[in-house]
Regions:
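N-proximal low-complexity "stem/linker" segments adjacent to membrane-targeting elements
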Residues: 1-26
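Short loop->beta transition adjacent to catalytic acidic/histidine clusters or analogous donor-positioning motifs
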Residues: 5-7, 28-38, 46, 60-61
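Hydrophobic/aromatic residues located in beta-strands of well-ordered beta-sheets
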Residues: 9, 36, 63, 91, ...
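Acidic helix N-cap motif at the loop->helix transition within catalytic regions
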Residues: 18-22, 45-54
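Short beta-strand/loop segment that forms part of the nucleotide-sugar
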Residues: 24, 33-43, 64-65, 94
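A conserved acidic beta->alpha catalytic loop
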Residues: 40-49, 98
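Acceptor/aglycone-binding surface of glycosyltransferases and processive sugar-polymer synthases
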Residues: 66-85, 90, 102-181
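Hydrophobic, well-structured modules enriched for small/aliphatic residues and gly/pro motifs
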Residues: 94, 98-101
Length: 181
């Protein structure tokens, strides 16, 4: 029997059959002791079926198959609630298309685990800091993303550069303190 992990990596999928098998292998290759939860929105390309089959051979992979295309926001929320309900200590969220490098998960975990007495509740793998990047986007998508993040920082008063990215690590106890209704 596999020892339970205290770390859950959550990724939302819709038609990610082309990338998900490689992503799962890359995550386990970097961090073999983590658990992975794939939240699939009933992908017609077989993503959910692949996940179910692979999870039978690897107890660290879990699948949450939803009835339809409900969207990435609710998929991530379902994954975060799953992590809380299952007693994980840390939750990493990332996209399934390799836009977030699996080998950087350990950097997010190291950052959230460091503490000078004050716990860190969330770490953002920002695209807009030194060392961060975005590859494969057309210029207008870069411009839109920069605009949305600048506007969000200004309106919400957030001291972060990347409000819209999905590469994050959360302390599950902090998530558990939120009202999920």
């Amino acid at each position: 029997m596999t020892e339970p992990s205290e770390i859950l990596v959550v990724t939302a999928t819709y038609n990610e059959m082309e990338t998900l098998p490689r992503l799962v292998e890359a995550i386990f290759g970097s961090l073999p002791a983590v658990d992975i939860l794939v939240v699939d929105d009933n992908s017609p390309d077989g993503t959910g079926q692949w996940c179910e089959k692979y999870s039978q051979a690897n107890a660290r992979l879990r699948c949450l198959r939803r009835s339809g295309k409900l969207g990435i926001g609710s998929a991530i929320a379902d994954g975060l609630r799953y992590a809380i309900d299952q007693g994980y200590r840390y939750v990493v969220t990332m996209d399934a298309d390799f836009s977030h490098p699996p080998e950087k998960i350990s950097d997010l975990l190291a950052a959230i685990q460091q503490s000078d007495g004050t716990p860190i509740d969330v770490v953002i793998g920002s695209r807009y800091v030194k060392g961060g990047n975005i590859q494969g986007w057309p210029w207008y998508r870069h411009l839109m993303s920069r605009g949305i993040n600048t506007y969000s920082r200004w309106v919400l008063g957030l001291p972060v550069r990347d409000c819209s990215g999905n590469f994050r690590c959360y302390r599950a106890s902090a998530l558990a303190s939120l009202n999920w209704e």
